[in-house]
Amino acid sequence: MKPTNYHLFDFMDFDVDLSKNESLWKAYKPTSVCEKGGDVHVVVPFQKQVLANDMAADVATPKEEYTLILRQYSNNIIRLFCGFGEYEMTDNSEMLQFSERIQQLPLHVKAEDGGWTILSADGVRRAYINVKAPVLDHWSDLLPEPQETLDVVLYPDGKKEVRLAAYDHFSPPRYDALPLAYCVKDGNKERATLSFECKADECFAGTGERFTKMDLSGHTFFLKNQDGQGVNNRRTYKNIPFYLSSRMYGTFYHTCAHSKLSLADVSTRSVEFLSDQAMIDAFVIAGDSMEEILRGYRDLTGYPSMPPLWSFGIWMSRMTYFSADEVQEICDRMRAEHYPCDVIHLDTGWFRTDWLCEWKFNDERFPDPEGFIHGLKDKGYRVSLWQLPYVAEEAEQIDEARANDYIAPLTKQQDSEGSNFSALDYAGTIDFTYPKATEWYKGLLKQLLDMGVVCIKTDFGENIHMDAKYKGMKPELLNNLYALLYQKAAYEVTKDVTGDGIVWARAAWAGCQRYPLHWGGDSCSSWDGLAGSLKGGLHFGLSGFAFWSHDVPGFHTLPNFMNSVVDDKVYMRWTQFGVFSSHMRYHGTNKREPWHYPAIASMIKKWWKLRYYLLPYLVEQSQKATQSGYAVLRALIFAHPADKVCWHIDDEYYFGDDFLVAPVMNSDDCRDIYLPEGNWVNFFTGEHFKGGQWLYGVKVPLEEMPVYVREGACIPVYPEDVDCTDEMDLSKVTHLCIDDSFKGVWK
């Protein structure tokens, strides 16, 4: 359908010809406000609309009343809930995991002339509900009077004002946003919308792994997980129904329904949310820092757990290793040539047939998998395995899975997409809404973990079979939530068997941050693939996630997806980015081992050793991230939300508290660098710089990277070369002091 540039069609999803049996119901001003169980209940009438290109009240149809509930948590979070029909407010949700900091604060109502003020017990104003008539200087009857509206101002922390978009219209019939409304189709309530005012200069970030510029204003996002098929488009593996505002608040929409989020786009003066569920459940979180807001989000949805030490070492993989002998040869060479490495990952080739996931080793190419795994462990390597949450028609488990409904029964045959990269090419999706199916899946993984495998790559999970009957919910609601249920199952059984909670996951939704870690999907081995990956990682860190990785040096090649050669400079610059990432894994469609790039192999080894040198710092910063709102990779706005320049920088980042990293993402070995406030020291040259300035046209030799460390920082480091983390004795950790005596890390 071609865009119309009208809210009713482009955002609210009504057909242009209005041929369907659909109606829109708009919120009017409240009729009563009262206290109930510590909450405030606001009775709101909704008026059906006569729809054309415009909207007008259908006065022949009686209004319907619904209750808008306001609930205050702690000192900076206010919750708005309005269920249309059968929906009720609940904390019983896979997405929610309240911390002990989430305490409900009773709210009180103070009636005033023209409205109600909502106060917490300490007398702090938390909301104001306005029903005063607008001030008019009446001189014309040319246009109809505007309809009533819902005018509510929220003060989540008692200071910051977040207002519903009560008056976002042109003439009275021409609306660009609605404060609160719902839709009815064929007699069923189907969609709901909530809108907040935004300011002309307001900026936004977050919403998941978003492969676009830092400031998201002027964009509308469809929050539906799907295979991103790269990192340079609007698709994404990881949608998170949460955004951050430069006005120092964030909003978490508690839903797993397919949704739209317009950030000053459909209307440039509103943030608009549309859910395919006839319910609004929004948590508005205010704070004095980005970290405080994100900590509030984690207080609601859960904190990341701490990955094991070995996971911070280097992972080596490709798509794919096909035999134990091949893996042994590669691992032995890395040890002989002292390329430090901790994890060897087996992708799609360890099964009976490539890509045919049966959760069993090929008994010809891996004749003794347990001995193979333990032999690698003796050399300091852990083994990670690829798999996916679908069962193929040819898999040996298919009859058992069908007979017991471990895969959701299809309601109709779906067309294959003719690719290994699609859920539709499998016979069914494992039904994680069904406890017996979850336990069956855990049993498949347990057999592998009992052999000594330490990590399961929980690939895919963005797409499910939509024409299927799942035990616990409709596929339209399960689609986004599926990643959480899938990763939770793999994480739990891994932790139960090995003691270490970890997965290697691609998809995500709200709550998935509890089950680290996630990587950025199938990027192209190119400069734009590198740039898109970093953008996605920065927004992901602004969406509640602490840990994130990416395929070094990109996953696929161009023009030939599997067989084009990766450029040496791309390999080198992406390696540098990987060293300064929370986790570092080499992976892709062709060879990734450094000796296949002989011109730069010695430089690569030097950078790998730098990674292990910095592991104590990385572990320190990771522990901090699991107890706060911080990510390991942080966009500059994390620390400088008031610096308008930082809202437009998506190619630099903080690595923990003390490192400022500016990857080179071109073949010219040159870039501009913004130094935010503070005093900075070049990590490789020892040169000192004052912050708050641009460095233009900085030339960067291939063996170096623009990395700056805070003046006065004291960085914990490991002083000895090691081949893996098993060789580390953490009592030997020393500190690198960034003072006048520091002349560069390699000097």
Question: What spans do the regions from the language model cover?
Answer:
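Active-site-proximal structural scaffolding
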Residues: 63, 235-236, 244, 273-275, ...
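Generic recognition of flexible, low-complexity loop/linker segments
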Residues: 56-57, 67-68, 228-231, 238-240, ...
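A conserved hydrophobic secondary-structure block that centers on an alpha-helix together
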Residues: 228, 232-233, 317-366
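Structural beta-strand/beta-sheet cores of well-ordered domains, especially the beta-sheet scaffolds
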Residues: 66, 114, 238-240, 247-249, ...
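N-terminal accessory segment at the very beginning of proteins
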Residues: 1-310, 319, 326, 331-332, ...
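Aromatic- and carboxylate-enriched substrate-binding clefts and catalytic-loop regions
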Residues: 83-86, 95, 174-175, 181-184, ...
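Catalytic core of carbohydrate-active enzymes
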Residues: 491-496, 500-501, 508-519, 532, ...
